[in-house]
């Protein structure tokens, strides 16, 4: 599904988010290869994850962005793990964020 970038709800403006080395790598990958994975929002269009991708779309002036709409927390976590796995395939090791598994 596609959604207007302006319809994605976040607590703060993505233009104000910090851009660190990790975000720069993800932005460069999107610029070279396109956006491979959509962002995930809930049914109220609130961003669940994919902030670096949303930030790239905002900076690039995209009008629309591919989204997955999901309200199930378990499915959101599964999607996040899947999408993170893809990012890990191209990010340098020192930029990979490790999460403690419960």
State each model region's role.
Residues 1-71, 75-91:
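Short, charged/polar connector segments at secondary-structure boundaries
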Residues 87-102:
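Alpha-helical interaction elements
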């Amino acid at each position: 599904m596609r959604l207007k970038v302006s319809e994605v709800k976040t607590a703060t403006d993505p233009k104000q988010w910090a851009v660190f080395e990790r975000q720069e790598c993800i932005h460069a990958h999107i610029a070279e290869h396109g956006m491979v994975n959509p962002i995930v929002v809930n049914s109220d269009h609130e961003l669940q994850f994919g902030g670096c991708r949303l930030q790239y779309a905002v900076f690039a002036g995209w009008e629309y962005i591919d989204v997955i709409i999901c309200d199930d927390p378990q499915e959101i976590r599964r999607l996040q793990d899947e999408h993170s796995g893809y990012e890990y395939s191209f990010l340098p090791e020192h930029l990979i964020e490790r999460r403690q598994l419960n």
